[in-house]
Structure formats: C-alpha cells, structure tokens
Swiss-Prot record:
Positions of L-serine binding: T242, A243, E244, E296, S405
Name the UniProt record assigns to this protein: Serine--tRNA ligase
Family as reported in the entry's similarity comment: Belongs to the class-II aminoacyl-tRNA synthetase family. Type-1 seryl-tRNA synthetase subfamily.
Subunit description: Homodimer. The tRNA molecule binds across the dimer.
UniProt keywords, alphabetically: Aminoacyl-tRNA synthetase, ATP-binding, Cytoplasm, Ligase, Nucleotide-binding, Protein biosynthesis
GO cellular component: cytoplasm
Coiled coil: none
Organism: Haloquadratum walsbyi (strain DSM 16790 / HBSQ001)
Length: 460
C-alpha cells in the first residue's frame, strides 16, 4: 500500500505511477475525495468527543451543588452529542472501509532510477553471463518436452489424466533431478545466511492481501472450497501461489527489533497458479504449468539498507545458475513491465536452446525467466503491518521487504535438459548436482513402467 501522506501531498506522483504502470481502473480523484471526507468526519468526531467530555465532567459538580435543572440540561446536551457522535462515527467507519478498499488498488510507485517504458519490449538487458565458453551442443537440440517423453522422465498425458492440463509427472531420473535441484538450491542459500522455513501451503485471504496478490490477482489463485467469483473473507483459504505469501506474512502485525535485522528466510514450496500458456510451445512441456516447485528468498530490512540488499539478493540468486554452468542474462524491468507491488525489479533469464523464439538470442533458443528479484519498499509492509523499532523506546517504522526466486525448479530443469543434452539424446548432469543424485552423471532414460497396461483398464 502506498504512503497515504504521499497521496495527500503529491497526488501527481501517484498519477504518474498509474500512467507508467498502465493502470486504468483506479479513480484517484474519487480516492482523494474519500480521504478528505473521512478526515473531515474524523475531525468532527474528535470535536464532538471533546465537547461531550467537557459537559460530562460538569454534571457531577452541578449535582453536588444542588443545581438539578442545570445538571438535567447538561445530561440532555451530552446525550445529543452522543447521538451525533455515533452517527459521525458510523459515517467515518463507512468512508474508511471504502477508502481502505480503494487504496488496495493503487500500485507501488516505481523507483526514480527505473527505466521508463510501456511494456516488456522496453526492458533493459544489463548483462549476459556464461556465453564466453559454451559447451558443444547437438546439431539439433531436442526440446525438453519431446526429450522428456523419449527418456521416460516426464509424463504429460498421465498428468492431464490425473489432474488436468498444465500438470505433469516427473518420473525416475526426472523426479530425482527435481529433488536434487531443490536440495542444491537450499544448500547454496543456507551458505548465504538464509534461515530455512517450510511454511503452510494453504494461505488465508488476509495474507494474500498483505503481499499484494489480492484483490488484483484473485482470478489466478486456486481457492479451497469455493469458486473464485464468490465474495471472500479474510480467513478463506487458497493454495500458495508463491512462498513469498506465507513467509512475508509470518511477521504480519508484528514489530521486530533493530537487532533482528536483516532477516533472510528461504522456503521451498510447491506453488499453484491458474495461469496457463496462451500459444505455441507455452502449452507444451513444463515452462508454464499450474503446479511447480520453487525456492523463494525473502528479506526484511531497514529502509536505508534496502538498495544494497537488493543488489545482494540478485547476486545470491545468480549463484545457482553460475554453479550449474548455465548461461543467463539479467534484465531490468521498465516501468510498464513492473508488477503491481514492485518498486524495482530484475529478471534472471536462463538460456534454453531447444526452442527458437523470435525474442531469443541471435544464436537461437529462448530465454526463460527463472527468478524475479524485487524491491517492494514499504508497500507490502503497510498492507501487512510489518514494522521494526530502531530503538526500544522509539516509535515503530515500516520495514522494507525484498524477495526473489532462488530459483524456479522446472525451468532450470528445461535448461539442463536442453543445454546439457548430448548427441545420443542423453543428458549430462551438471557436476555440482551429481552428489545429490548418488553420483549419477548421465540421464539415459529407463524402461517404460506399466506401458503394457495402458488402456487395459479403461472403462467402457
């Protein structure tokens, strides 16, 4: 949530943010009017409360002095003020509820240093890593979705049968590779000073509001027990779309001490999102699916440390790809491609050579986003009540929150399957991962499991 003082003192800055982020469904003039009317009601309520307290304090003295008529008149005045105060408070509460709801729709204001642009085509590539010494690739790199089926390590048909489109089985060495990547990532970030957390997978609506998923992205979430178009309460449950939600809300409505900071937490979770590919290869394979594994890095820092920690977080996420020997690039998001909650963001995109895309590098292949490293400033903290106290006797201030994937597992699997593919259709396992797979160095596939039974038990 944006700073309400900023809204009042510099509404043009908010208008600029709405324009830069392409937000058209926020009526800022209406919000400013609501805020003004709420403050007027609140001020009037304070006046009435003060006036009533003064009159009430006289009643006892008047009775003690034997002036019953004056005491009765004062009691009547006090009751009138009480009635008026209750009406004013009802109006103020209604206005505040409308204002709070409207404020949740205003996006974060971009950092002044963010490049201005309208959409992803104007993002800025900052650097590329790992392209100076590429390994030799087959003349034709088989896309991961075909290779995964050939090697019997990915099964899309059965995933669709069991659950639906956008779900898959990782099998045999494919499952082992996925597990190995998770443990590999957790070990790396543990070295970097991260605390491990394994959070609840269902999260309530209030948590989704706290991190900014709601109310804007309700349609992308999986709701437990109800349909998405029904009204939701704060305690309704949803499947976790990212560990950012439960981890950030761990400290919701709490005050941390300065000595606690920075807090660095990592969490592995399965993540659930309704989004799906719209065309082409996005509907095939494991690039964009409804359930995927990810290690998330969440930081809670002092405002003055926010920029430096943002750079540090980017470096920490990059280490995963560096150790795996995967080529990648760093993109800085322009204003038009910043998310709703983000003040500044970098994307880490790994190179996957199996599918040639128009937006890919000149040597072919495609870019796959495996991490978004984001600085939210105090935006999430205001929504979730995340504060810290610089000194024990000082007033509490809002924290800054940052997060980044460290990293998304399926897309790294895609990059490994395509970049470490050999001429004979096998996959070399990057050396740092081999200890996590009991020394296995090459995925050669395995005999089909239960293929003779496919269709045999199908009901007519």
């Amino acid at each position: 949530m944006i700073d309400r003082q900023l809204l009042r003192k510099n509404p043009d800055a908010i208008r600029g943010a709405l324009d830069e982020k392409g937000v058209t469904d926020v009526n800022l003039d209406q919000i400013l009017t609501l805020d003004q009317e709420w403050r007027e009601r609140k001020a009037r309520g304070d006046e009435l409360r003060h006036e009533r307290n003064q009159i009430s304090s006289k009643i006892g003295k008047l009775k003690a002095a034997g002036d019953e008529d004056a005491a009765s008149e004062a009691i009547a005045q006090s009751q009138e003020l009480k009635n008026e105060l209750e009406e004013i408070e009802r109006e103020a509460d209604k206005l505040k509820s409308e204002l709070d709801t409207a404020m949740l729709k205003i996006p974060q204001v971009p950092d002044d240093a963010v490049p201005v642009g309208t959409d992803e085509s104007e993002n800025v590539e900052r650097r590329r890593e790992g392209f100076d010494s590429l390994r030799s690739l087959p003349d034709t790199v088989i896309p991961h979705y075909d290779l995964g089926e050939e090697l019997e390590i990915l099964d899309f048909e059965r995933g669709a049968k069991v659950t639906g489109g956008g779900f898959y089985f990782a099998k045999g060495d494919g499952a082992r590779l996925e597990h190995a990547l998770v443990q590999f990532m957790l070990d790396i970030h543990r070295e970097q000073g991260y605390q491990d957390v394994f959070p609840p997978i269902p999260v309530n609506s209030q948590s989704m509001v706290g991190t900014g998923q709601f109310p804007k992205f309700t349609e992308d979430a999986y709701r437990i027990g109800e349909t998405n178009d029904e009204p939701w309460d704060n305690d309704d449950l949803w499947l976790c779309p990212t560990a950012e939600v439960p981890v950030t809300n761990m400290y919701r409505d709490e005050i941390l001490l300065d000595d606690d900071l920075p807090v660095k937490i990592q969490a592995y979770t399965p993540n659930f999102r309704r989004e799906a590919g719209e065309h082409g290869t996005e509907t095939r394979g494991i690039v964009r699916v409804h359930q995927f594994n990810k290690v998330e890095l969440v930081n809670f820092v002092r405002p003055e440390d926010s920029a430096e920690r943002f750079d540090g977080l980017l470096t920490e996420a990059e280490v995963v790809l560096q150790r795996l020997g995967l080529p990648y690039r760093i993109l800085e998001m322009c204003t038009g491609d910043l998310g709703f909650t983000q003040r500044k963001k970098y994307d880490i995109e790994v190179w996957a050579p199996g599918d040639d895309m128009a937006t890919g590098p000149d040597i072919g292949g495609r870019w796959l986003e495996v991490s978004s490293v984001s600085n939210f400033g105090a935006f999430q903290s205001r929504r979730a009540g995340l504060r810290y106290r610089p000194e024990r006797h000082e007033s509490a201030s809002y924290l800054h929150t940052l997060n980044g994937s460290g990293v998304a597992v399926p897309r790294v699997m895609v990059a490994i399957m395509e970049y470490y593919q050999n001429d004979d259709g096998t996959i070399t396992i990057p050396e740092p991962l081999q200890p996590y797979m009991n020394g296995l160095s090459v995925i050669e596939g395995h005999d089909p499991v239960g293929e003779a039974a496919v269709g045999a038990g199908k009901r007519e």
